[in-house]
Amino acid sequence: MGAGGRMSDPSEGKNILERVPVDPPFTLSDLKKAIPTHCFERSVIRSSYYVVHDLIVAYVFYYLANTYIPLIPTPLAYLAWPVYWFCQASILTGLWVIGHECGHHAFSDYQLIDDIVGFVLHSALLTPYFSWKYSHRNHHANTNSLDNDEVYIPKRKSKVKIYSKLLNNPPGRVFTLVFRLTLGFPLYLLTNISGKKYGRFANHFDPMSPIFNDRERVQVLLSDFGLLAVFYAIKLLVAAKGAAWVINMYAIPVLGVSVFFVLITYLHHTHLSLPHYDSTEWNWIKGALSTIDRDFGFLNRVFHDVTHTHVLHHLISYIPHYHAKEARDAIKPVLGEYYKIDRTPIFKAMYREAKECIYIEPDEDSEHKGVFWYHKM
């Protein structure tokens, strides 16, 4: 995955790891003015087309696997199942991305429609829609703020745990990456791991969690009921089809969605060129600019371009995915050196970031003491 090697764009040259500037000379208004007006239009018909398209593709994958893999000789079936898992997880991640767009009111002009579609899609993929919508909103409002960001908050050198030092070797990095990719999102939802530190235990299922305010608590409970309904449906499927069938056809692809989601967001927010800010330096546009686009090759399209339009998304989150590339290209001349896309092959980038981005510290000789950069051990 990842194109690698294409260097025609000045935002992706040899110095891709070079730090971005920290004092943008433009405003959000300047960026919006550069984007064609039609890019802000949200069509419920066009958005719904992508939902239907992905559902049809997901059904085709299901039908082929359910019908033909049981007919394949056992040794070959062991190869066929991972192919199904990858394909189904990929298309389901596309549906998850559409649910995420609903949370940003980028699906249609009607908030109710957005919330209904997002609630159904995310619940089916075991994500508490409203709960995650609200915590994710906090992330967008406080991106790369060391004091207030909701997730992906790196540690200072003095706070690095002993196990991080023990795992600072090739086998340890592989273990850390596998753990992060498979369990990172479920543990974030359940225990707020890697999330903002609150005065008490926080998770995404407790309506009284400090993550949420009083106006959001009823909808958090609604998210829980949505998941309970899905778990009840899973129970009925296990009774009818057996646990092995449910695991192969549904559970592993849904786990794959979590893997893809963590992989994408980890790479968007973890890079040697990206700063973090304390309260003396942070403002909204500085934080929103502190992300990087990535190239997932053919999966860019499957994931509805969320992989390589993330910088735009953090600046203007309500632009629908089918206008995102055009809008991104429109603001790139304004962004200049503040925009970066890293086309390093994904597995190589994953390992590099796990090796190089361990903790953050400000530069000792810098006048910006509230600007923090990644370092390795």
Swiss-Prot record:
Topology of the protein relative to the lipid bilayer: Multi-pass membrane protein
EC number: 1.14.19.-
GO annotation, biological process: unsaturated fatty acid biosynthetic process
Sequence motif Histidine box-3, residues: 310-314
Entry keyword Oxidoreductase: yes
Keywords annotated in UniProt: Fatty acid biosynthesis, Fatty acid metabolism, Lipid biosynthesis, Lipid metabolism, Membrane, Oxidoreductase, Transmembrane, Transmembrane helix
Pathway field: Lipid metabolism; polyunsaturated fatty acid biosynthesis
Top-level taxon of origin: Eukaryota
CDD domains linked: Delta12-FADS-like
Transmembrane segments: 55-75, 79-99, 112-132, 174-194, 220-240, 244-264
Molecular function terms, GO-annotated: oxidoreductase activity, acting on paired donors, with oxidation of a pair of donors resulting in the reduction of molecular oxygen to two molecules of water
Protein location: Membrane
Enzyme class, broadest EC rank: oxidoreductase
Record comment regarding domains: The histidine box domains may contain the active site and/or be involved in metal ion binding.
Family affiliation: Belongs to the fatty acid desaturase type 1 family.
Function: Converts linoleic acid into a conjugated octadecatrienoic acid, probably calendic acid.
Protein's name according to its UniProt entry: Delta(12) fatty acid desaturase DES8.11
